[in-house]
Amino acid sequence: MLLRRRNGPCPFPLLLLLLAHCICIWPASAARDRYARQNNRQRHQDIDRDRDRDRFLYRSSSAQNRQRGGANFALGLGANGVTIPTSLEDKNKNEFVKGKICIGTKSRLSVPSNKEHHYRNLRDRYTNCTYVDGNLKLTWLPNENLDLSFLDNIREVTGYILISHVDVKKVVFPKLQIIRGRTLFSLSVEEEKYALFVTYSKMYTLEIPDLRDVLNGQVGFHNNYNLCHMRTIQWSEIVSNGTDAYYNYDFTAPERECPKCHESCTHGCWGEGPKNCQKFSKLTCSPQCAGGRCYGPKPRECCHLFCAGGCTGPTQKDCIACKNFFDEAVSKEECPPMRKYNPTTYVLETNPEGKYAYGATCVKECPGHLLRDNGACVRSCPQDKMDKGGECVPCNGPCPKTCPGVTVLHAGNIDSFRNCTVIDGNIRILDQTFSGFQDVYANYTMGPRYIPLDPERREVFSTVKEITGYLNIEGTHPQFRNLSYFRNLETIHGRQLMESMFAALAIVKSSLYSLEMRNLKQISSGSVVIQHNRDLCYVSNIRWPAIQKEPEQKVWVNENLRADLCEKNGTICSDQCNEDGCWGAGTDQCLTCKNFNFNGTCIADCGYISNAYKFDNRTCKICHPECRTCNGAGADHCQECVHVRDGQHCVSECPKNKYNDRGVCRECHATCDGCTGPKDTIGIGACTTCNLAIINNDATVKRCLLKDDKCPDGYFWEYVHPQEQGSLKPLAGRAVCRKCHPLCELCTNYGYHEQVCSKCTHYKRREQCETECPADHYTDEEQRECFQRHPECNGCTGPGADDCKSCRNFKLFDANETGPYVNSTMFNCTSKCPLEMRHVNYQYTAIGPYCAASPPRSSKITANLDVNMIFIITGAVLVPTICILCVVTYICRQKQKAKKETVKMTMALSGCEDSEPLRPSNIGANLCKLRIVKDAELRKGGVLGMGAFGRVYKGVWVPEGENVKIPVAIKELLKSTGAESSEEFLREAYIMASEEHVNLLKLLAVCMSSQMMLITQLMPLGCLLDYVRNNRDKIGSKALLNWSTQIAKGMSYLEEKRLVHRDLAARNVLVQTPSLVKITDFGLAKLLSSDSNEYKAAGGKMPIKWLALECIRNRVFTSKSDVWAFGVTIWELLTFGQRPHENIPAKDIPDLIEVGLKLEQPEICSLDIYCTLLSCWHLDAAMRPTFKQLTTVFAEFARDPGRYLAIPGDKFTRLPAYTSQDEKDLIRKLAPTTDGSEAIAKPDDYLQPKAAPGPSHRTDCTDEMPKLNRYCKDPSNKNSSTGDDERDSSAREVGVGNLRLDLPVDEDDYLMPTCQPGPNNNNNMNNPNQNNMAAVGVAAGYMDLIGVPVSVDNPEYLLNAQTLGVGESPIPTQTIGIPVMGGPGTMEVKVPMPGSEPTSSDHEYYNDTQRELQPLHRNRNTETRV
């Protein structure tokens, strides 16, 4: 009708409708606008008035909500859920149908700033929601008329339900069936945790008629004024653990009288009417249901075990709710896997029915804000995986550094984000971030006080690219003007959203002027809320949907600085930005560019950039680095090159087979292998090298040849060594043609002999070439060869004696001729005339001597005269000469004899006669330096331990006149000790000062004040035994094998110095740094004699389980016995500090070792290392390896540690770090009284400041050194019991062969001394000289029982005979340290037994000074043994 009359006059009804609109609608709209403005002003007043109240903490949740209650700032909310489609048909009528999934909240009981807006948030969050993923909190609803119908569709809550301060009279959850209780609510004052908790509410009824199951947690009701019917509910039917509900009512007024349940209700009810009767599916079941659910009372009416809250039938499809997972109307224990095994093909294949586990639901695809990992929807990837396209995939190499988010950013946690790429969680910057605050723990105890955060420290976020949760900014500070430190942030995933307004990016009431997050490309989930920022510009012009992933994501940007004021202030986008807006001022802050984008900066044209080109209509890109100008991508589009051009490409340098010719690459000569020019030689402008080259005699290259060419005539082929460093270095590893020897025309190597020279330049003589034939040769010009002439010829024309030109001796003419002729050549040469021509004729000078048949005239007389003259002349010369020589010799000998007699007379008269002959030992002088320091230079700290004659302190050495502090350990000799202890003290200093090695504890100095002190390096990390026990999970194979190698190196050094340690164990190896260990305890080390390889001890405790059998039986100690102890020490390391033979008594060890007992193979130890350890435990000492061999073996192991030790997680083990700050703290503790201005120095750097730099294992020692086992107890307390692993004074029976001995053995398997004191021991102690001279009987002890003669225990005693009171002893006749008797007799050592010393105790086995210093006495009837 309206269409037919559209051109005619308006009908009357339409006029009335228009009038009604003018009268009613417009005033209503105006009133609504006025109400909105008034409400807005009221809201600002409420926010300002409630700023302090925002921090109000309810007593059960104060610690969890200290970040400011004003977080609930929302002014509006849009629902943000995940809809999961279902394939159920309507005819199934199954109640378990998932629809919309909503995210729960975590704000507990925090008070909202605006309760009306709080109600709107709840309404928008849960409208049409059927599945709450998290907690459902219904709080602070004081208006009893509020509509709660938005709760009608909720069927399942995965967390807990909290109802607090709700005044609505009736709260109804008509379809709620199950509360899973995966997260529970708890009051801090009580231990109970609740899945349903109702408190301080004035509602009359809480109606949940379909609630069937609470899988975890309890139910509680606390101080509810009017709530009825809750006490009638049979909670054991609902709560899975079967407990009853918790009720508490503390008000003075009595509880409200509640109406009775409907008559149709068999037990309890939720409210009035039959629909609120409690339903039962557990208490009414048959016993055959085994405590599960049922759908009837009969035995066969039990629900499936996967059902929760009851069922309608016996199968998995009949469940009302699922206990584990819901998969298309079927309850399952697990979701269908994404991959399944194919038994036919034996491979894993993709499962077409596979689904992901999301909460208690199986879904085909995970929600957009979650990640896929191993068939589950997760919020973050595990440590070894990274997010790639919404799926967790293994990292290719190191994973991007991921840091956990924080509830509030403050000065205490900001440094944890340094170098982070991904923040797994949320970032919140609040007012207290910049003002500081006092932390309060969940148990209401005071936490740390955080200082205000300097805004400059926020630069740590410059490396962050992703935030998996949300970013919340609510802080103000004068310097907090922008978010430029998030300039590299690319994605906010929003896997966790703020409870108010579902915000992923929320900036409220901040002091920001601009955002400047120029690289933010996407907000995957959640809304954008930017409100009440009075100085913030630019945000209103940003097109937020361009960076939001889903269209339903909301944006609230309002009540910031007005656009006209921003424009007035000039805080507007650049003219190069398009309508999408910008993050701040500048052309690099645009979301998109109006013209062109060049590396994130907007420009008007690509021509403004010299080395850029137009990639497309919107993008400029930089030219290739080798292009100075270009017209496209790649080095082949260059218009001008930066370096050189090779064909169509610009390159940084010419390829190997080309050279640079004024910016263009030209081909090298064909024979070159790389070049700088066109020539075919080697040098500038020629080849760099070539495969084959002809060289001159001066080793310069004449020209290059091709690889397959042959050397020309006159040259030979020669290989150039790869290490060549001379003029032929460019040809190293290649070949050259070297010129033959000048005497050789054709050759195969340099030389002129037949083996290398095939043709001579001039002549050949035998096997070598000659320039010309020698005089004793003749020349064959045709063959150009020299032949040897006849021996009797002087010049010849042939090889025979008849070819001579002249003779060496005599000519022999033909016998038929009557006489020689001057020009006759018919003769032979001979060395001796024949009998028939035995006469030599010298008459003809031109002919020379020749053989003749008859003598010449007067030849006989002439011959006789010549012989006589020779004898006369010879005799006349020789006889006088001999006589003169004899006379001179006699006179010299007489003078020498007189001079000796004069010297002897002079020495006798002057008293300088030396009757003692020299006995040179050929041993060099010990020139090691021993530094002496003053007592005032030392600052002692706490006691590290005690020994038999001293204490060990940690301390600091401050050298006088120098501004330096050195951490040291100070060993101080007690004043109560005697002279013998002082001697032993100095002997230890002598040994430690004489030996210097990187793996031996270094003696720094000695203090000779009233109390003698040794100053050594301070080992900050204690002994290696404790270190491996305390850091077992952090020690890898590399560290273990490095320590083993270092111990072997230190012991190899002692072996070279002929020192026997005697007590090598892990407890006597100290740790300076995690990479450096040092062997300690030289107090028991003994120097071997130069003519002996063993040392025999007469007393002292012995670590039985660390010693070789010969040590236990005969007390014989050698370097090979140290090898046995080394094997046990390495076994301790590989077992991380286990005790050897822990369950075997020490008294049984000798017998068991003799029958083949060995330590078992450690779990992490390979067979290679264990075989090495077994070689150290050979019963025959000669079969054991040396320490030099062990050093080589373990160094080889350390090069491939993973091959020889199998430690779980080896690659992830990291030893504890040791920082310079720890060093400074230690110095502050050790020397608190110093002014602190001194610099900290390493002991090695201080003592050797000019050492050449090089690799060194020395590091700073700045930590406290644990107690050394060597100094365990106060030696003055002789009755004390140690009670530890190092000592045990109880005696034990030890077996040696078939002999059983009752010997004292301590708990650490140390064999106690067996010698007993003589009856006059006390007197001898008071008079050592008398004791030394007296003969003391040998007491019956261990050494006597086994029949081994007692040996010299202290050879160094002979060095100090006067000190020890042996004044009458003859001077030793051998080297220092080698005890030798001065007469024909022998020597016997008689040692007193322990017990005669009143101060002796079990812990003195390291400092057994009385036994070690016993004087030696001579006995002519005994034999010397060393």
Curated annotation (Swiss-Prot):
Post-translational events: Ubiquitination by Cbl in response to high spi, promotes its interaction with Graf and thus facilitates its GPI-enriched endocytic compartment (GEEC) mediated endocytosis and its subsequent degradation.
Signal sequence bounds: 1-30
The name this protein goes by in its record: Epidermal growth factor receptor
Record EC number: 2.7.10.1
Phenotypic consequence of Y341E: In dim-arm; Does not form dimers even in the presence of spitz
Entry's localization field: Membrane
Annotated glycan sites: N128, N241, N419, N443, N482, N569, N599, N617, N816, N823, N828
Active site: D1063 (proton acceptor)
Top class in the EC scheme: transferase
Subunit details: Homodimer. Binding of the ligand spitz triggers homodimerization of the receptor however, it is able to form dimers, albeit weakly, in the absence of spitz. Interacts (when phosphorylated on tyrosine residues) with Vav (via SH2 domain). Interacts (when ubiquitinated) with Graf. May interact (when phosphorylated) with EGFRAP (via SH2 domain).
GO function terms (MF aspect): ATP binding; epidermal growth factor receptor activity; identical protein binding; transmembrane receptor protein tyrosine kinase activity
Transmembrane regions: 869-889
Function: Receptor tyrosine kinase, binding ligands of the EGF family and activating several signaling cascades to convert extracellular cues into appropriate cellular responses. Known ligands include spitz, gurken, vein and giant-lens. Transduces the signal through the ras-raf-MAPK pathway. Critical for the proliferation of imaginal tissues, and for the determination of both the antero-posterior and dorso-ventral polarities of the oocyte.
Outcome (variant: D646A): In tether; No effect on binding to spitz
Record's keyword annotation contains Ribosomal protein: no
Protein source organism: Drosophila melanogaster (Fruit fly)
